[in-house]
Amino acid sequence: MKTNSLSAWILAIRPYSLGNSVILILIGSALAFTDGGFRPVVALLCLVFAVTMQCTANLVNDLCDFLKGADRPDRLGPDRAFAKGYITLRAMKSGIAAFTLAACAAGAGLLALSGWNWWLLLVGASCIVFAYFYTAGPWPLAYHGMGDIAVILFFGLIPVGFTYYLQCGGWSGETAV
């Protein structure tokens, strides 16, 4: 595979994992629709935010697992683009930054459409922080038994709950089920 090629990036963002983000936004939007609050533009921005955050998390994971020695070029399972040398360090860091900025742009749109509820900025920022610190930083959550909790929150409750909230303007217990 050619270094930094489109096929290398497709491998790195792990498209097979993106269905999780899509499904969670669809669930939150379906609940909003059922309750009469569906807002297509908000749903689309939630989808962009969720998918770009998933891509960010996948790229950070690809990079940091290799740097920490968890992934090697000869690992069992799907190839990891950085471990295989398909993406350079500089390109990987740029890709992480680009997907993070795309998520921030979608988040800014959601913030504006929410009427500038600034506490939502904290939620968006926490999504970014946890996407990084799942496998990055001095105390990666995935390596200290906290990965499952982070996944339940940031790839479960938060996407469904906030997709609903941003469309309906309130909470529903159904989003936690």
Model regions and ranges:
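Topogenic membrane-insertion module of multi-pass membrane proteins
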Residues: 1-45
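Cytosolic, membrane-interface loops and tails of multi-pass inner-membrane proteins
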Residues: 1-6, 63-87
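Intramembrane alpha-helical segments
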Residues: 2, 78-80, 84-170
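Alpha-helical transmembrane segments of integral membrane proteins
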Residues: 7, 16, 20, 41-45, ...
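Hydrophobic, lipid-facing residues on alpha-helical transmembrane segments of integral membrane proteins
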Residues: 18, 22-27, 48-56, 154-161
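Membrane-embedded alpha-helical segments that form the functional core of polytopic membrane enzymes
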Residues: 26-27, 36-63, 119-132, 172-177
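Alpha-helical membrane-inserting segments
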Residues: 27, 31, 56-60, 106-109, ...
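Early transmembrane hairpin module of multi-pass membrane proteins
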Residues: 53, 57-64, 82, 93-98
